[in-house]
Amino acid sequence: MSVMITILNGPNLNFLGQREPKIYGTETLEDIEKNCREWAKRADVIINFYQSNYEGQLVEWIQEAIGLSSGLIINPAAYSHTSVALLDALKMFSGPKVEVHLSHIYRREAFRHHSYTSIGVDAIISGCGSDGYRFALEYIAKQLINCKR
């Protein structure tokens, strides 16, 4: 199954490993990317892995993934609580989509309990740390296999 999955990471995730390790863990975004690429290689999946602190760039990457990628994973970080633009872009992507959060957003401050972007995805994985990315990859791969049956 050679398919492409786009993985997008939002603001401040480039500081993983340094930023609030009690909440986000000690792994860096580079560690997470390496683990995703290792999983993808075993599963014969191609991944595009991106990070931006800019909402418009994330929107553009979602738009680029339309027609190019079979699935999409997004950790919108703080934009999940504010971005209708990301929600609208996610709604345009027709393949399986998963929102990932390293921390358990419902055990944090009340303003983090609402996610606009979650309306535009098929599943949310929250509170599993970096394993959430692997769970999302496995979910999307399974959805794509089931679609081919």
UniProtKB/Swiss-Prot annotation:
Q: Which residues cross the membrane?
A: none
Q: Give the reaction(s) catalysed.
A: 3-dehydroquinate = 3-dehydroshikimate + H2O
Query: What pathway or pathways are given for this protein in its record?
Result: Metabolic intermediate biosynthesis; chorismate biosynthesis; chorismate from D-erythrose 4-phosphate and phosphoenolpyruvate: step 3/7
One Pfam family this sequence matches: DHquinase_II
For this chain, the family text in UniProt reads: Belongs to the type-II 3-dehydroquinase family.
Q: Which organism is it from?
A: Bartonella tribocorum (strain CIP 105476 / IBS 506)
Q: What is its EC number?
A: 4.2.1.10
| A GO BP annotation | chorismate biosynthetic process
Q: Which gene encodes it?
A: aroQ
**Subunit and interaction comment:** Homododecamer.
**Keywords noted in UniProt:** Amino-acid biosynthesis, Aromatic amino acid biosynthesis, Lyase
Main function: Catalyzes a trans-dehydration via an enolate intermediate.
Return the broad EC class: lyase
Query: Which residues are named in the active-site annotation?
Result: Y24, H101
Q: What Gene Ontology terms describe what this protein does at the molecular function level?
A: 3-dehydroquinate dehydratase activity
For binding substrate, which residues are annotated in this chain's numbering? N75, H81, D88, L102, S103, R112
Name of the molecule in the record: 3-dehydroquinate dehydratase
Is-annotated flag, keyword Chaperone? Answer: no
